[in-house]
Amino acid sequence: MTRPVLALDVDGVLNPSGSLSNLDPGCELHRIEIPACDVPDSPLVSGSGTRDLSTTVALNPSLHGAWITRLRGEYDVVWATTWEHTANTHLAPLLGIEPLPVGISVTTHPAYRGEDDDGIVSAWKARALSQAYPDRALVWIDDDNHAYATDPTWNTAHRWAAECDPRSGLTPAVMNRVETWLMHASRSM
């Protein structure tokens, strides 16, 4: 039996963008220094490969790290983020998780560069995930997939876009809905 796929974004999902006073008590702030050679070649990152990148992330290893580790026993959990392999190098250790496969990449989906279907920035991810996992049950958690979260042609019995509020990120309520969906999807495959 083929395992369902859980595709995770980072910024706005595992790394909420809300004010410090609104972050979950389990969030830990980390300053990350990424050498230029490790900066993903992404149109979202200025100076990719030429300048070091310094950023602060708020991660919750006790909530998200434990959840990801547990779900990996039954599902294929992959990165769906412009962090790509850098997420494994810099974020996975902070979350207390083993490295995850990179499910989609801006470098292998060139349609992303300069295109955004009708202003939908996450359209490249939707296309890339559909191409990468055409016959798999798939849940995609992102803070910028609103157009897909409400699209009945994208959300089917075997594919669902679960959205997060970027200010709070991945909450226990969203995690519970995702887990319920994954359980139903794995039974119906």
Where do the model's predicted regions map?
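Alpha-helical substrate-recognition element adjacent to the catalytic core
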Residues: 2-114
